[in-house]
């Protein structure tokens, strides 16, 4: 495994990544569900914002609210900032930090493809995986959800999305006060392999949220959410049991010949 210090300059691959992030919309099928679970005045934390695909969806849903897009990686953040500017997302604030269980400095590992370009979608904190032939690394700042809420003096937090390659449980540990106080809805990408690399286990993430009164759901065809009984890899929506959305029919309502999403 080759480990290199982070160094970046504009290249053809950067322009390709930027063009893709600017002109394409991933996760389009989730837009109706996000619109139902993220009110127009919502405050949203998009953690691991990457190149802004979810950020764009949240910005449209919370068009009278505020989206905080957390992205510690310099390469991804340079794309994210440009996407936010080009799309005129004035309700988005890009935050150059990672979120975890405590405030500190850590190492962000960015896989390098055989072409030499960054596999920045798989960037993660901590030790590099042996599956990669070469990686770049940079030092980044880590803080907590609770710390950000206190610093910004937020009086609400409606939604947290986190896709941070195994650090999701660490994020939850740093958000305990916020989860209890604001009961935000969550969208988490959970991988047993990635969580193990971070020193955690998949079942622990589900148990942590269940103990705090959250119910797990999974997106299914037809833009509906189905309850989940057991821990597994995938993208999961966690909704507080007392939240009406946890017991509502979350399938989109169709009227006459109105087109679907």
What annotation goes with each model-predicted range?
Residues 1-261:
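Phosphate/nucleotide-binding beta-alpha loop and adjacent structural elements of enzyme active sites
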